[in-house]
């Protein structure tokens, strides 16, 4: 068996997330359809991150196994995939890796970024790729709140928990980068819970708009609550940025 590793990017707005679903357009479904055709066998793709509906990726990593090369070098497969896949999925890199490599379980760290556009007027070309907030955001409060999420915390209050049994996570990095009207949040951890980054961003924005306090956020990080601190930020500002192995 040959174990292939792909680094891919995609625009998530017209997909129902990464994971394959019957009758719905997904990243996994599109990849498996093309790869199964090329290798003339049923191909199953494994992704490092199962992004939700509308979420984008700059550096998603997947792997799949095939019975042989079928005459494909890494370079040739790279080019053929980019010709056959839809325009909103791009293959960035193709490698043959050790049989033990698993895109999800071999990952050491995942990075996400979230883009906020803070201006009193909407930008037509950013509307599908960022969260537009017209009210002025207190950037200092964004910085302070991001620091609170760094370290080991139970994120039960900041995720969708129906099927999550491990909610204690160490967040390695949590910080904002500002470039004019673009506010870009970076976060890294070994893994993330469903909608976790969106709940974190939504919480920080609530504080930065003066609706909640840093003290309230600290309390939510210490003990489980029945009510959420905030609603999740919309999916179209979120990107799976990078996966480290």
UniProtKB/Swiss-Prot annotation:
UniProt xrefs under NCBIfam families: hisT_truA
SUPFAM superfamilies: Pseudouridine synthase
A Pfam family it matches: PseudoU_synth_1
Annotated EC: 5.4.99.12
Family annotation (InterPro entries): PsdUridine_synth_cat_dom_sf, PsdUridine_synth_TruA, PsdUridine_synth_TruA_a/b_dom, PsdUridine_synth_TruA_C, TruA/RsuA/RluB/E/F_N
Function statement: Formation of pseudouridine at positions 38, 39 and 40 in the anticodon stem and loop of transfer RNAs.
Family listed: Belongs to the tRNA pseudouridine synthase TruA family.
Protein name: tRNA pseudouridine synthase A
Residues annotated as the enzyme's active site: 52
GO molecular function, one term: pseudouridine synthase activity
Ligand binding (substrate): 112
GO biological process: tRNA pseudouridine synthesis
Underlying gene: truA
């Amino acid at each position: 068996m040959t174990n292939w590793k792909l680094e891919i990017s995609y625009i998530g707005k017209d997909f129902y997330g990464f994971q394959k679903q019957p009758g719905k357009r997904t990243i996994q479904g599109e990849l498996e359809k093309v790869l199964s055709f090329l290798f003339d066998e049923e191909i199953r793709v494994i992704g490092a991150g199962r992004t939700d509906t509308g979420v984008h990726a700059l550096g998603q990593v997947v792997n799949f196994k095939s019975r042989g090369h079928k005459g494909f070098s890494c370079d040739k497969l790279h080019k053929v995939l980019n010709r056959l896949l839809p325009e909103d999925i791009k293959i960035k890199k193709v490698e043959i890796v050790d049989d033990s490599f698993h895109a999800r379980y071999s990952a050491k760290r995942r990075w996400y970024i979230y883009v906020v556009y803070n201006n009193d007027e909407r930008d037509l070309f950013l509307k599908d790729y960022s969260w537009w907030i017209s009210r002025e955001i207190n950037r200092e409060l964004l910085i302070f709140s991001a620091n609170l999420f760094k370290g080991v915390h139970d994120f039960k209050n900041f995720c969708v928990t129906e099927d999550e049994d491990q909610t204690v996570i160490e967040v390695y990095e949590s910080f904002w980068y500002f470039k004019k009207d673009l506010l870009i949040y970076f976060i890294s951890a070994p893994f993330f819970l469903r909608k976790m980054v969106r709940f974190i961003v939504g919480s920080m924005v609530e504080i930065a708009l003066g609706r909640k306090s840093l003290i309230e956020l600290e309390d939510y990080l210490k003990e489980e609550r029945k009510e959420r601190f905030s609603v999740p930020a919309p999916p179209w500002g979120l990107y799976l940025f990078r996966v480290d192995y």
